[in-house]
Design a protein with these regions (language model features):
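Non-catalytic accessory regions flanking glycosidase/transglycosidase catalytic cores in CAZymes
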Residues: 1-110
Length: 110
């Protein structure tokens, strides 16, 4: 008798507690992009990635997944997944561009 992946998945799901929550998470640097927009200042990662020789091919998060401009579409995709939870982060330099002092209202709005 052959066991299919679907049968194994069904058994796994059935073994989870009733209150188990399926979720996804993102990291600001990996998805936000828009590094020079709406008052955001460079983060430690921006600086590190722009240092020659530190990152293969000089790759960086300047555009990333462009979540800053595509958030409604991204949230709709997450909703379509049918998950229960979504955890995310917002780049601190977007909210607190100077590290102290007044907050960036555009960063809070995002």
């Amino acid at each position: 008798m052959e066991t299919t992946a679907t049968a194994v998945e069904a058994d796994l799901i059935a073994s989870l507690p009733a209150n188990f929550r399926w979720g996804v998470a993102t990291s600001a640097y990996q998805i936000e992009g828009a590094v020079d927009e709406d008052g955001r200042t460079p983060s430690i990662w921006d600086t590190y990635c722009r240092t020659p020789g530190m990152v293969h091919n000089g790759d960086n998060g300047d555009v990333a997944c462009d979540h800053y401009h595509r958030m409604p579409e991204d949230v709709a995709l997450i909703k379509d997944l049918g998950v229960d939870t979504y955890r995310f982060s917002v780049a601190w330099p977007r909210v607190q561009p100077r590290g102290n002092g007044p907050v960036n209202e555009a960063g809070l709005a995002f």
